[in-house]
Amino acid sequence: MNSENLKDCFDNLQDGTVLAFYKSGLIGSIIPFFTRENKGEEPPHHVGIVYDVKRNKRRIAFKISEQGFHGGQYRDVEINKFNDTYYTTDKYFLKQKKVEMSPIKMTSEQIKRGIEDAIAQIGVKYGFTRLVLGAEFIERFLPKNFRRNLFLRLNKKNKLRICSTHIAFNLNKAGFNIPLDDIYSPLELIKLIQCLK
């Protein structure tokens, strides 16, 4: 991740911004093969949502709510500025080719509800079913209706979260009407969010 990309985050991050992470190297190159994106679309491999943004002239600190194999996290990230150089010590950010932002305009009440949901998910892990549903190759090979029916059957309690569905659930708790009857790839989620703007 380069200094220019970090500068963009430094200047523009706000509460409710969804971050899309794009990995470089072998993993980044095989993701398009396994997912449903159209030819030429570059799919992110992970998404998270930003809350609790605090900034001054030399530093921006925020928390990112995300769900992964490690379970739910609501972790601290900092981006610092030294002269005209922007940097972070966050290991996950450093591994990325780039990070793109999709800001969502939120009221203070929506932000509060989103943060409450993010905190409630700390440490919550999903089991084997969630791993299978989250596997990217399933995104490509299961017909949408079959996938949706499977998801609804396994998710009767509306608790099933992987990185992209975690964002959908979080935004619903915050007061946005995003359908919870399907499992979304990170790119599908980003497209849904862009319709909220």
Regions found by a protein language model. Give the residues of each.
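Active-site-adjacent helix/loop patches that line small-molecule binding or acyl-intermediate pockets
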Residues: T88-N149
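Loop/turn positions that initiate beta-strands
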Residues: D15-T17
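Beta-lactamase-like hydrolase cores
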Residues: M1-L13, K23-I30
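Solvent-exposed, acidic/flexible segments
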Residues: E41, T107-I111, K156, L160, ...
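A structural signal for the main folded, soluble domain(s) of proteins
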Residues: V47-V50, K54, Y126-T129, N170-N172
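Activation targets extended, charge/polar-rich intrinsically disordered C-terminal tails
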Residues: T129-K197
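Glycine-rich catalytic cores of cysteine/serine-nucleophile enzymes that process amide/ester linkages
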Residues: F21-M106
